[in-house]
């Protein structure tokens, strides 16, 4: 049995997919797409090593300890080159995680022809008339190249050392004078590029699990600046001490959303030792945090917030706070509830030394079946 390692490319920005969620984090059942695709291929062969390129290593590591992860580059070629640094097997198989449903039959065709060339690649024939600059091309000479592809590791490394931009391994090796061997591709190995492609693939739908997160934050009064809650000015001078603008509600809500998604906490994302967050707009930071949560495949169901303050009174501001949260997070206002309470003059809140906020949120997986 030949010694083969597997590289799965999962660091792309999903620009052409044109949704808030990156396609590699679409949920198939409970698995993100990148994991589903990697599990599928890894079940076909005892790979020496499995390497996944990533733009979010710490989060992806939460799903499995069976693979190695490496930060991707700005391009496919850069990501692959970095991953190859971890590979020392004679052969390497490379695939895009966006090719989710590669079959065992296609995989076997690649393995069976391993000794035929320097790179073995699947390809589809073109059935339709094909034009280039309004001129018909000879479709018999056209191939639609797919992945996974198997290459001789040393030759692929050498090809990528040219620092040219190749869109797949076979063209990189061909540019070095290497021999390419084509096997029959398959429709199921088509790349998921546009959201419309989801309708062409028979994929498991997202599970209906709900993920709950809580956030709690406290700040002391003392700054001669506006008191902001959810970006709404409550008082012109009763500001809270903080590195940012002191919006304790936004901080609490940010923590709740990050926690529900398993993405850490506000201090990790926006450390108070970083001067770029000095006096930062906390509602903008909240939006950025939720964008990160959506990128990895979640969306909000509802928000419930309890503001604890002896003073000032907040009754007249609750509606404005709910509206501003809804606008910031692109969420229906009926899914947001803001409550206010005192501590009956007990503790630091009762002594009007500061205020606290407790936020609870529920998330679900992004439902890509609605696209």
Swiss-Prot record:
Binding-site positions, 4-CDP-2-C-methyl-D-erythritol 2-phosphate: 217-219, 243-244, 265-267, 270-274, 341-344, 348, 351
The keyword Metal-binding belongs to this UniProt entry's keyword annotation: yes
Co-factor requirement: a divalent metal cation
EC number(s) given by UniProt: 2.7.7.60, 4.6.1.12
Keywords, alphabetical: Isoprene biosynthesis, Lyase, Metal-binding, Multifunctional enzyme, Nucleotidyltransferase, Transferase
GO molecular function: 2-C-methyl-D-erythritol 2,4-cyclodiphosphate synthase activity; 2-C-methyl-D-erythritol 4-phosphate cytidylyltransferase activity; metal ion binding
Pathway: Isoprenoid biosynthesis; isopentenyl diphosphate biosynthesis via DXP pathway; isopentenyl diphosphate from 1-deoxy-D-xylulose 5-phosphate: step 2/6; Isoprenoid biosynthesis; isopentenyl diphosphate biosynthesis via DXP pathway; isopentenyl diphosphate from 1-deoxy-D-xylulose 5-phosphate: step 4/6
Top-level taxon of origin: Bacteria
Coiled coil: none
A Pfam family that the UniProt record links to this protein: YgbB
Gene3D superfamilies, per the entry: 2-C-methyl-D-erythritol 2,4-cyclodiphosphate synthase (3.30.1330.50), Spore Coat Polysaccharide Biosynthesis Protein SpsA, Chain A (3.90.550.10)
Ranges for region 2-C-methyl-D-erythritol 2,4-cyclodiphosphate synthase: 211-371
Family annotation (SUPFAM superfamilies): IpsF-like, Nucleotide-diphospho-sugar transferases
Gene Ontology process terms (BP): isopentenyl diphosphate biosynthetic process, methylerythritol 4-phosphate pathway; terpenoid biosynthetic process
InterPro entries per the UniProt record, alphabetical: IspD, IspD/F, IspD/TarI, ISPD_synthase_CS, MECDP_synthase, MECDP_synthase_CS, MECDP_synthase_sf, Nucleotide-diphossugar_trans
Record-listed a divalent metal cation binding positions: 217, 219, 251
Record's catalysed reaction(s): 2-C-methyl-D-erythritol 4-phosphate + CTP + H(+) = 4-CDP-2-C-methyl-D-erythritol + diphosphate; 4-CDP-2-C-methyl-D-erythritol 2-phosphate = 2-C-methyl-D-erythritol 2,4-cyclic diphosphate + CMP
Record site feature (Positions MEP for the nucleophilic attack), residues: 139, 191
Region (2-C-methyl-D-erythritol 4-phosphate cytidylyltransferase): 1-210
Site residues (Transition state stabilizer), renumbered to this chain: 16, 23, 243, 342
HAMAP family in the cross-refs: IspDF (MF_01520), IspF (MF_00107)
Function: Bifunctional enzyme that catalyzes the formation of 4-diphosphocytidyl-2-C-methyl-D-erythritol from CTP and 2-C-methyl-D-erythritol 4-phosphate (MEP) (IspD), and catalyzes the conversion of 4-diphosphocytidyl-2-C-methyl-D-erythritol 2-phosphate (CDP-ME2P) to 2-C-methyl-D-erythritol 2,4-cyclodiphosphate (ME-CPP) with a corresponding release of cytidine 5-monophosphate (CMP) (IspF).
Family: In the N-terminal section; belongs to the IspD/TarI cytidylyltransferase family. IspD subfamily. In the C-terminal section; belongs to the IspF family.
Name of protein: Bifunctional enzyme IspD/IspF
Gene: ispDF
